[in-house]
A protein has these predicted regions:
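Juxtamembrane/disordered regions of integral membrane proteins
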Residues: 1-145
């Protein structure tokens, strides 16, 4: 499978913006990055890699053929893909991480769910704008799937 420059630009821009919003939310608003007990450069490096993977999966969900029937707007398609990935990530995080933490209440879970949806929706919108505004000389269909 070959990818176009539209893919790479949208993928990287989405990952960078989601990573920046992650750092803003957890580093400045919640200030819970200060509780990390191991190497911060290692943590941020791994987080960067994770956001590259999340952005790739988000792009692939955005490109799902089933969306062709229901969404003609690139941005609405990005919002929908971001919502789906946000809910899935919240479920994974809730099962693997939050469930082992003490003092987690419903308000915290709701806020975390809404944040995951918002963060991934930001990434989906960036991908949608990339698909909308980045010009490709060759059609992406020429690259195959």
């Amino acid at each position: 499978m070959q990818y176009s420059s539209r893919f790479y630009i949208s993928w990287l821009a989405s990952a960078i913006l989601m990573y920046a919003s992650f750092v803003g939310w957890h580093g400045f608003f919640l200030n819970d990055l200060s509780y990390i007990t191991f190497s911060k450069p290692l943590f941020f490096g791994l987080a960067g890699f994770v956001y590259l993977v999340i952005s790739y999966v988000l792009y692939r969900v955005y490109e799902a053929k089933i969306f062709d029937r229901y969404f003609y707007s690139a941005v609405l398609r990005g919002v929908t893909a971001g919502f789906i990935i946000g809910v899935i990530l919240f479920a994974i995080i809730a099962v693997l991480g939050i469930s082992f933490t003490k003092h987690v209440n419903t308000t915290y879970l709701l806020a975390d769910c809404l944040w995951q949806i918002a963060e991934q929706t930001i990434g989906g919108v960036v991908i949608g704008f990339g698909k909308l505004f980045l010009f490709e000389v060759r059609s992406e269909a020429d690259y195959g799937d």
